[in-house]
Curated annotation (Swiss-Prot):
Residues 923-933 have a biased composition (Basic and acidic residues). TSP type-3 repeats lie at residues 691-726, 727-762, 763-785, 786-821, 822-844, 845-882, 883-918, 919-954. The gene is THBS2. Residues 731-750, 841-944 are annotated as: Disordered. Glycans are attached at N151, N316, N330, N455, N582, N708, N936, N1067. It comes from Bos taurus (Bovine). InterPro entries: ConA-like_dom_sf, EGF-like_Ca-bd_dom, EGF-like_dom, EGF_dom, Thrombospondin_3-like_rpt, Thrombospondin_3_rpt, Thrombospondin_C, TSP1_rpt. Belongs to the thrombospondin family. This is Thrombospondin-2. GO terms for biological process: cell adhesion; negative regulation of angiogenesis. Disulfide bonds join C391-C423, C395-C428, C406-C413, C447-C484, C451-C489, C462-C474, C504-C541, C508-C546, C519-C531, C551-C562, C556-C572, C575-C586, C592-C608, C599-C617, C620-C644, C650-C663, C657-C676, C678-C689, C705-C713, C718-C738, C754-C774, C777-C797, C813-C833, C836-C856, C874-C894, C910-C930, C946-C1167.
Length: 1170
């Protein structure tokens, strides 16, 4: 009665335990994640615990995370309890690897910790991060991924990381850091089964997944039913392994939506159960003692029976006791192979078996047989007999069998392969109940058929032993049948159906036709009979007389069809393909003349060759590829025409660029047709590329490039700081950008007043912090050192600043070279520098910084290309670059003859260079006048950044317009720009108001790229670049903030700047000033000022001392904009396609806002106008 109560109490423990739990000591992860049968991708199964479902997940992108409220309570419990326990019932797919639990965030790809069951390695891995460092701890030989249900307990408490499977400790390890003290909940998510990547999701079934916060692992395992070695009573119960098997399985009350409590099952108190266990322990000891005493008594009885000749019940019965067994009167048994014994009146009488004399010269002794035997001729080839099997009955009469084998391919093999004999292991006691037992199977019968597939049968009897005293009969069948395969049966052949009659051999005067059949339905097999009859049959056909044939004289042109009539007349059909005529007389057809576009045409002669008959095309011209059709007749010429396409090694993968380089197709007119540029993160000549850590276009190590191709193949002299110009004044191998003393004069650059000129004495007469040896005005204070005419004499002390031989006081354009001093509007400002040359405006004010004075600026621009209508050379067609190669006042975009050579653009082989003769020596459809230099600017197309605009040939920001976006007030100073690398690198050194350094080159479609680097850790604000600049009120800007921050001036509008890359379009109604300033700082839209087109949702800010590479693609015609930002070789931010047609092009520039020491290096712009 005690055992059922004990089992009932242990079964009821999980429910009682769940009810006793504090609401923050156990969390049902499925419940607080809202995972149920309605969850997409979650499939329900039956697990070890029938009261709750088990789940398998197949769509991990739909798995919901733990609710934010419960996640906060969980992390607080982890800190309070110094860790946690994870319990679950799991059935993991064999040799799979998957995540059990993970805490992801705050970033989209960052994980604070995760627990992974690694099947291939047979480990349970704990991965966590502390202070940006990853820690991985693996428990080995855990045996979880074997497709078997396991009840696991994972302990992560204090400095311990352990795994228990059931009640057994599998492995344990010490934690390096108590990571659970540093977990963050804001913007974090906790997932069950969801891995960081697709291949690390958990594959298998999970049930009862809980996070538990107990005081110790012993308490938790004890509540799960595991016995601890703490006393004799516990040992007494656990030793009896047959009494009770506990399957550790915890069912806990989840913390989440309320569920109905399971009813109480156990009505006994813990004291009553403890008393039962103590009573059972005592009973166990008593039973063991009784069992030992019974064994001793049995041994004594055995000894007494041997002394008195049998047990008391058999003393008056005639029987014998031999070798511990009873034998009935006259019962005979075999003691060994040559001795037989018989029971005679309580006595055992034994005698030797006598053997007859052998009848052969070479008798054969068989093991287990007393007498020798002779091998008969028919038994040649047989193997020796095998050992006899054990007796089929444990008492009474049974049978034994043995077998042998024979090679039937070379022997007759007469005689049986199996022998059976009777055996007896003692008389059965008929006074006891006995179940029946099967005898050995009989040999298989012969096959039921002589050919084909039949059956063989064997039987057995339920007599070893026979059931008695109500014993059970034998289970199973006494007959067994299986298929047998005889030799194949013969198949007689049969004919297939007759084939159709063949055509008659003649059309008249009698001919023969025939038909055939085949003996294959079926064909004869296995000795079957062949088909009877013939395989071919013939009969006469077309017996009528033949008419007179007028075509026998071949009156028609060869190839034309001739038709004959019964009266002897005839007619000719049409001429064959490639000929013209009436069928009797035909002449060659010139397909080339009729179908003029059958072959590819160039500026030279037609490439079609007429033949008799037919035509063919010449091969495609050099640097083209395509087909070379040929044929006969107009239909062929109109159907298949020659198509020759320009060769494109980049598309055909026939280029020789490096695997880390991009192949750029220049056109089939260029020689070479492509160029190679190393990808971001690499540098070199494109044929060879090496790693480039600072993204300035120079490799970390010297590269072995092609002969004389040293540019971008020499080792970077500042490998960790962008310096695309590689300036090295003192030639010491260390670039000026990272050299503390550029001129080697012993004075560090920070203190040197002539950083690039040896002057250890540091004389500075005018106290402008520029040493006398390098001061272009040593006696006049001019720290800016501006020298407009680049003659070595600064503007501050020059009498002719622009070098036009007109002194400053008489020069109406003192900063612009103008020897003619023309001043059309008479305002004292020369036409060369007058922003309104036809309107009197001596003050030259230009509020919107669009280079057009306010007096003549009407801002009417119908095509939105940045040029007002009365100054636009194509006012109705967007052409921001205003290209006009024939200088006729009409822009190329709306001029049908750009070079004014009398050849329309659509037929001109040099559209931008006048060549009325259209000379093309190599016949490649590119005129000789513009071969390899399409815009005739003396820069080869392969090196020209704008090969179709002679006004722009290379990237150059040496001349730029400084635009101050908040020119009033003293919040900060204006930007200070330092020019390097012939205008391909600019450095902004000041912590300034928002400002732009915008170049003067204008673009429609453009690609703009550069390297971004902040060489300080003192600030965290904005920097970036502008494109489509038309005025200080109208432009696009890409700006990047390091950290999220509210602008310190909250008037006129509140401005919140979020970290990350932003793409904005500025269309300000107020222009420069505090309104535009705050709108630029703000991440979002500000009405009448700025609209945000895209902000990187990852909110990744730039890092100090880290090189980034941006790439802008802008196609104003469609509005396509895309911004890519690389960190090293990897893409950090990608806007994807953004479409906006606010502006149809403009100028390019660089942007800063309150950020100092910003490097813009290796700048590159390329025109993409077609």
């Amino acid at each position: 009665m005690l055992w059922p109560l004990l089992l009932l109490a242990l079964w009821a423990w999980p429910s009682a335990q769940a009810g006793d739990q504090d609401e923050d000591t156990a969390f049902d992860l499925f419940s607080i994640s809202n995972i149920n049968r309605k969850t997409i991708g979650a499939k329900q199964f039956r697990g070890p615990d029938p009261s709750v479902p088990a789940y398998r997940f197949v769509r991990f992108d739909y798995i919901p995370p733990v609710s934010a409220e419960h996640l906060g309570r969980i992390t607080e419990a982890m800190r309070r309890k110094e860790g946690f326990f994870l319990t679950a019932s799991m059935k993991q797919d064999r040799r799979s690897r998957g995540t059990l639990l993970a805490l992801e965030g705050p970033g989209a790809t960052h994980r604070q910790f995760e627990i992974v069951s690694n099947g291939p390695a047979d480990t349970l891995d704990l991965t966590y991060w502390v202070d940006g460092t990853q820690h991985v701890i693996s428990l080995e030989d855990v045996g979880l991924a074997d497709s078997q249900w396991k009840n696991v307990t994972v302990q992560v408490t204090g400095e311990t990381y352990s795994l228990y499977v059931g009640c057994d400790l599998m492995d344990s390890f010490a934690l390096d850091e108590p990571f659970y003290e540093h977990l963050q909940t804001e913007r974090s998510r906790m997932y069950v089964t969801k891995g960081a990547a697709r291949e690390s999701h958990f594959r298998g079934l999970l049930q009862n997944v809980y996070l538990v916060f107990e005081n110790s692992v012993e308490d938790l395992l004890s509540k799960k039913g595991c016995q601890q070695s703490q006393g004799a009573e516990t040992n007494a119960i656990s030793e009896n392994t047959e009494t009770l098997h506990l399957s550790p399985m915890v069912t806990m009350e989840h913390v989440g939506p309320s569920a109905e409590k399971s009813p109480e099952v156990c009505e006994h108190s813990c004291e009553e159960l403890g008393s039962m266990i103590r009573e059972l322990s005592g009973l166990h000891v008593i039973v063991n003692q009784l069992h030992e005493n019974l064994r001793k008594v049995s041994n004594d009885n055995q000894f007494l029976w041997e002394l008195i000749g049998g047990p008391p019940k058999t003393r008056n019965v005639s029987a014998c006791w031999q070798d511990g067994r009873f034998f009935a009167e006259n019962e005979t048994w075999v003691v060994d192979s040559c001795t037989k014994c018989t029971c005679k009146k309580f006595k055992t009488v034994c005698h030797q078996i006598s053997c007859p004399p052998a009848t052969c010269a070479d008798p054969w002794f068989v093991e287990g047989e007393c007498c020798p035997s002779c091998v008969h001729d028919g038994e040649e080839g047989w193997s020796p007999w095998a050992e006899w099997t054990e007796c089929s009955a444990t008492c009474g009469s049974g049978t034994q069998q043995r077998g042998r084998s024979c090679d039937v391919t070379s022997n007759t093999c007469l005689g049986p392969s199996i022998q059976t004999r009777a055996c007896s292991l003692g008389r059965c006691d008929h006074r006891i109940r006995q179940d029946g037992g099967w005898s050995h199977w009989s040999p298989w019968s012969s096959c039921s058929v002589t050919c084909g597939v039949g059956n063989v049968t064997r039987i057995r009897l339920c007599n070893s032993p026979v059931p008695q005293m109500g014993g059970r009969s034998c289970k199973g069948s006494g007959r067994e049948t299986k298929a047998c395969q005889g030799p194949p049966c013969p198949v007689d052949g049969r004919w297939s159906p007759w084939s159709p009659w063949s055509a008659c051999t003649v059309t008249c005067a009698g001919g023969i036709r025939e038909r055939t059949r085949v003996c294959n339905s079926p064909e004869p097999q296995h000795g079957g009979k062949d088909c009877v009859g013939g395989a071919k049959e013939q009969q006469m056909c077309n017996r009528k007389s033949c008419p007179i044939d007028g075509c026998l004289s071949n009156p028609c042109f060869p190839g034309a069809e001739c038709s004959s009539f019964p009266d002897g007349s005839w007619s000719c059909g049409s001429c064959p393909g490639g000929f013209l005529g009436n069928g009797t007389h035909c002449e060659d057809l010139d397909e080339c003349a009729v179908v003029t576009d059958v072959c590819f045409a160039t500026s030279k002669a037609h490439r079609c060759v007429n033949t008799n008959p037919g035509y063919h095309c010449l091969p495609c011209p050099p640097r083209y590829k395509g087909n070379q059709p040929f044929g006969v007749g107009l239909e062929a010429a109109r159907t298949e025409k020659q198509v020759c396409e320009p060769e494109n090694p980049c598309k055909d993968k026939t280029h020789s660029c490096h695997r880390h380089a991009e192949c750029i197709y220049l056109g089939h007119f260029s020689d070479p047709m492509y160029k190679c540029e190393c990808q971001t993160g690499y540098a070199g000549d494109g044929l060879i590329c090496g790693e480039d850590s600072d993204l300035d276009g120079w490799p970390n190590k010297n590269l072995v490039c092609a002969t004389n191709a040293t540019y971008h193949c020499v080792k970077d002299n500042c490998p960790l700081l962008p310096n695309s110009g590689q300036e090295d004044f003192d030639k010491d191998g260390i670039g000026d950008a990272c050299d503390d003393d550029d001129d080697n004069d012993g004075v560090s650059d920070e203190k040197d007043n002539c950083q690039l000129l040896f002057n250890p004495r540091q004389f500075d007469y005018d106290k402008d912090e520029v040493g006398d040896r390098c001061d272009n005005c040593p006696y006049v204070h001019n720290p800016a050192q501006i020298d407009t005419d680049n003659n070595g004499e600064g503007d501050a002390c020059s009498v002719d600043i622009d070098g036009d031989d007109v002194f400053n006081e008489r020069d109406n354009c003192p900063y612009v070279y103008n020897t003619d001093q023309r001043d059309t509007d008479g305002d004292g400002v020369g036409d060369h520098c007058d922003n309104c040359p036809l309107v009197h405006n001596p003050d030259q004010t230009d509020v919107d910084n669009d280079l057009v004075g306010d007096q003549c600026d009407n801002n009417e621009d119908i095509d939105e290309d940045g040029h007002q209508n009365n100054q636009d050379n194509c006012p109705h067609i967007p052409n921001a670059n205003q290209a006009d190669h024939d200088r006729d006042g009409q822009g190329d975009a709306c001029d049908s003859d750009d070079d004014n050579d009398g050849i329309p653009d659509d037929r001109d082989n040099c559209r931008l260079v006048a060549n009325p003769d259209q000379e093309d020596s190599d016949g490649d459809r590119r005129g000789d006048a513009c071969k390899d230099d399409f815009d005739n600017d003396s820069i080869p197309d392969i090196d020209d950044v704008c090969p179709e605009n002679n006004a722009i040939s290379e990237t150059d920001f040496r001349n730029f317009q400084m635009v101050h976006l908040d020119p009033k007030g003293t919040t900060q100073i204006d930007p200070n720009w330092v020019i390097r690398h012939q205008g391909k690198e600019l450095v902004q050194t000041a912590n300034s108001d928002p400002g732009i350094a915008v170049g003067f080159d204008e673009f429609g479609s453009v690609d703009f790229s550069g390297t971004f680097y902040v060489n300080t850790d003192r600030d965290d604000d904005y920097a970036g670049f502008v494109f489509g600049y038309q005025s200080s009120s109208r432009f696009y800007v890409v700006m990047w903030k390091q950290v999220t921050q509210t602008y310190w001036e909250d008037q006129p509008t509140r401005a919140y700047g979020y970290s990350g890359v932003s793409l904005k379009v500025v269309n300000s109604t107020t222009g420069t000033g505090e309104h535009l300033r705050n709108a630029l700082w703000h991440t979002g839209n500000t009405e009448g000022q700025v609209r945000t087109l895209w902000h990187d949702p990852k909110n990744i800010g730039w890092k100090d001392y880290t090189a980034y590479r941006w790439h802008l693609t802008h196609r104003p015609k469609t509005g396509y904009i895309r911004v890519l930002v690389h960190e090293g070789k990897q893409v950090m931010a990608d806007s994807g396609p953004i479409y906006d047609q606010t502006y149809a092009g403009g100028r390019l520039g660089l942007f800063v806002f309150s950020q100092e020491m910003v490097y813009f290096s290796d700048l590159k712009y390329e025109c993409r106008d077609v």
